[in-house]
């Protein structure tokens, strides 16, 4: 349900005196006005976790957030870019062309120095979609054995405004490939990404600690700063 629908159901479900009714009518009008004034923004993802994260960041700025989960028909988007930035804009551009509204999309992954930046944009499908991350992580550890262990998580957020103008914001967190898989928190490549300031992998720290330095958080901060300036 939309914000408006939820508010109106709540409004209609309460029986009250004439005085209270007038107050609630005034409140309902304010809700209508607030919803009309809200700017809509589409998150080009079907990942519920990402939708929640973006919503928490954008709602305070007056945005009504929607996602691909709200659409009756799926949008098929081929991510064929060679960089995170290209893929982020490809997804945002495709959704904008279909929906004609402001769109945000992101692409992220792990880039290992000793592997010439791999798995990079292929992080999700590295060694095949059906390969579990324990296998992927051990493979990377074996590849960097006795080599440079530097690595970075990268997140690029593509933003296509309602008028079609395009922008991209990149967040990076540097670290090292751990000598062994460590930690049971997080997901993906977190158990092998050692973050020196924490003296631990990202799978060994709390979600709050991870989010404080995450690549997505850093990219989001840049997007938020831009949107705040755009609204002035």
Language-model region placement:
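Polybasic, lysine-rich low-complexity intrinsically disordered segments
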Residues: 6-8, 23-27
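Short hydrophobic alpha-helical segments enriched in small aliphatic residues
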Residues: 12-14, 20, 28
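Short, Lys/Arg-enriched N-terminal segments with co-localized hydrophobic residues
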Residues: 26-37, 229
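Anionic-ligand binding patches
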Residues: 39-42, 48-232
């Amino acid at each position: 349900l939309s914000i408006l629908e939820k508010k109106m159901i709540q409004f209609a479900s309460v029986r009250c005196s004439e005085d209270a009714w007038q107050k609630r009518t005034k409140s309902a009008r304010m809700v209508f006005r607030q919803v009309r004034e809200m700017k809509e923004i589409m998150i080009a993802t079907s990942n519920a976790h990402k939708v929640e994260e973006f919503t928490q960041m954008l709602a305070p700025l007056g945005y009504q957030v929607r996602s691909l989960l709200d659409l009756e028909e799926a949008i098929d988007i081929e991510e064929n870019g060679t960089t995170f930035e290209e893929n982020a804009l490809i997804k945002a551009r495709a959704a904008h062309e279909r929906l004609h509204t402001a769109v945000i999309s992101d692409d992220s992954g792990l880039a290992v120095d000793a592997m010439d930046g791999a798995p990079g944009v292929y992080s999700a499908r590295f060694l095949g979609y059906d390969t579990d991350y324990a296998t992927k992580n051990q493979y990377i550890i074996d590849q960097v054995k006795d080599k440079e262990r530097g690595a970075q998580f990268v997140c690029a957020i593509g933003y296509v405004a309602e008028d079609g103008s395009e922008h991209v914001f990149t967040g990076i967190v540097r670290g090292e490939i751990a000598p062994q898989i460590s930690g049971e928190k997080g997901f993906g490549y977190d158990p092998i990404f050692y973050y020196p300031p924490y003296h631990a992998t990202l799978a060994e720290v709390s979600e709050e600690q991870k989010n404080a330095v995450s690549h997505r958080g850093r990219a989001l901060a840049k997007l938020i700063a831009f949107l705040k300036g755009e609204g002035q």
